[in-house]
Amino acid sequence: MGFWKLSPFLAIGLLVMYQAGILQAAPFRSALENPLESATLTEDEICVLLTAVVKDYVQMKARELQQEQETEGSSLTAQKSSCKDGPCVTNRLEGWLARAERMVKNTFMPTDVDPEAFGHQHKELAA
């Protein structure tokens, strides 16, 4: 597993050293004898190789993150499903009821609360 974390950086490092000329071996024949066997990569080949390495690294990190979320999600569902005793169920129902009450108050209650709002007439007391 540790190798896969290091492999993108290793590949990029090798590519950089290769382009810098550090990893090129001494040729047995002159480069002028056979121009088709060039030891350098073109700009397009470098871009394609670098893009592939970065894409592989991003996919690897996405898989690791997804696995972490799945393991966290499974532990949370196990904790939620273990709530079968009386106080736990009561607390859960109380939370649902409080959320429903807030929703009803926010959507159905008028903001101008006075006697006329509900159809009642305010009668002044005659002295």
UniProtKB/Swiss-Prot annotation:
- Disulfide bond in keyword set: yes
UniProt-annotated stretches for the region Disordered: 65-85
| Signal peptide start and end residues | 1-25
Q: Which InterPro entries match?
A: Calcitonin-like, Calcitonin/adrenomedullin
Give the stretches traversing the membrane: none
Q: What GO molecular functions are on record for this protein?
A: calcitonin receptor binding; hormone activity
Biased amino acid composition, Polar residues: 72-81
Q: Which GO terms describe its biological process?
A: adenylate cyclase-activating G protein-coupled receptor signaling pathway; regulation of cytosolic calcium ion concentration
Any one GO CC term of the record: extracellular space
Which keywords does UniProt give here?
A: Disulfide bond, Receptor, Secreted, Signal
Disulphide connectivity of cysteines = 83-88
Q: Which residues form the propeptide?
A: 26-81
**Main subcellular location:** secreted
Q: Does the keyword Hydrolase apply?
A: no
Under Pfam families, the record lists: Calc_CGRP_IAPP
Compartments, as annotated in UniProt: Secreted
Q: Which family does it belong to?
A: Belongs to the calcitonin family.
Return the protein name: Calcitonin receptor-stimulating peptide 2
Q: Gene name?
A: CRSP2
